[in-house]
From Swiss-Prot:
Its EC number is 2.7.1.130. The keyword Hydrolase does not apply. The gene is lpxK. Keywords: ATP-binding, Kinase, Lipid A biosynthesis, Lipid biosynthesis, Lipid metabolism, Nucleotide-binding, Transferase. Pathway: Glycolipid biosynthesis; lipid IV(A) biosynthesis; lipid IV(A) from (3R)-3-hydroxytetradecanoyl-[acyl-carrier-protein] and UDP-N-acetyl-alpha-D-glucosamine: step 6/6. PANTHER family: TETRAACYLDISACCHARIDE 4'-KINASE, TETRAACYLDISACCHARIDE 4'-KINASE, MITOCHONDRIAL-RELATED. Transmembrane segments: none annotated. One of its GO terms (molecular function) is ATP binding. One of its GO terms (cellular component) is plasma membrane. It catalyses: a lipid A disaccharide + ATP = a lipid IVA + ADP + H(+). This is Tetraacyldisaccharide 4'-kinase. NCBIfam families: lpxK (TIGR00682). Belongs to the LpxK family.
Length: 328
């Protein structure tokens, strides 16, 4: 239903307009206060890069963060990552992730980023505290990438990157809750790089698509072509589950059942195992897999995806960030 409201297919969005005007008024006032320096943003002693969205819902932001961190690491840059830690609840903040940190403590996306990149990752509702925690333990870090937080204006940033779903784009264009917008599309004029996941990119936008890898068994680490798996039940607890189901079909998999879950939904053995019957194979997203390691069964697999950016602009962006991190 919410997708139909946000896309404009359902007339119910008009009933939510008063709340959207209120949301826009409050969010605009907050940004204006920082722009006029009525409120002071905290500036880190190293460059900060924000990777965020203008809309609610999954746009492919986390794969972009992983891509960015890995690309900078390959260039010899020491990167730290901070996040709000949605879906997790730590005993205290800031929380610096370790090999023992669970998704219940830090949230699924920070744990995924930590496992994929081995970069220092910290979470806190106050992102400046997370930055301070990283720099205190890892003073050699040269640049901070913040996973989400475009609207977290109390943290000063040097570069802003926005990820857009190229198919859904901005829906009906209205602020939450009548539409998907956290900020209106005009905000793109001040963004340093706009990355478009799928669809047809417009002038000045960087095309991106998600490239699936081999399926990985949660219990054994065995890898295989996902098309070799039989009697598949697909599970996705991400911002936009249909994208994952479409990826499976693109890989030649026709799931017997597709199970969309809420983004950041907590998972347990009983609930997940109930999704599959004897002889079926469960295939989930990597974001779901980090929540299932402790209780995974032998017929549970996940499909990792990597962001693939096209054109000349990604190299220019990486050169800019490398120069920033190097102090040039």
């Amino acid at each position: 239903m919410i997708e139909k409201i946000w896309s404009g297919e359902s007339p119910l969005w008009r009933l939510l307009l008063p709340l959207s005007w209120l949301y826009g008024l409050v969010s605009g006032a907050i940004r204006l206060c920082y722009k006029l320096k009525l409120k002071r943003a905290w500036r880190a002693p190293v460059p900060v890069v924000v990777v965020g969205n203008l809309t609610a819902g999954g746009n492919g932001k986390t794969p972009v963060v992983v891509w960015l961190v890995e690309q900078l690491q390959q260039r010899g840059i020491r990167v730290g990552v901070v996040s709000r830690g949605y879906g997790g609840k730590a005993e205290s903040y800031p929380l610096l992730l370790s090999a023992d940190t669970t998704t219940a403590q830090a949230g699924d996306e920070p744990v995924l980023i930590y496992q994929r990149t081995d970069a220092p990752v910290a979470v806190s509702p106050v992102r400046s505290d997370a930055v301070k925690a990283i720099l205190a333990q890892h003073p050699d870090v040269q640049i901070i990438v913040t996973d989400d937080g475009l609207q977290h204006y109390c943290l000063a940033r040097d570069v802003e990157i926005v990820v857009i779903d190229g198919v859904r784009r901005f829906g009906n264009g209205w602020w939450l809750p009548a539409g998907p917008m956290r900020e209106r599309a005009g905000r793109l004029k001040s963004i340093d790089a706009v990355i478009v996941n799928g669809g047809v990119p417009r002038s000045g936008e960087i095309p991106m698509h998600l490239l699936p890898g081999q399926a990985v068994n949660l219990r054994t680490g065995t890898r295989c072509d996902v098309a070799q798996l039989e009697h598949v039940v697909a599970m996705a607890g991400i911002g936009h589950p249909p994208r994952f189901f479409a990826t499976l079909k693109m890989c030649g998999v026709q799931p017997e059942k597709c199970v969309p879950l809420a983004d950041h939904q907590s998972l347990n053995h009983a609930d997940v195992s109930a999704l599959v019957s004897t002889g079926q194979t469960l295939v989930m997203t990597e974001k779901d897999a980090v929540k299932c390691w402790a209780f995974a069964e032998e017929n549970w697999w996940y499909l990792p995806v990597d962001a693939q950016l096209s054109g000349d602009e990604p190299a220019k962006l990486l050169a800019q960030l490398t120069s920033l991190a190097s102090g040039n």
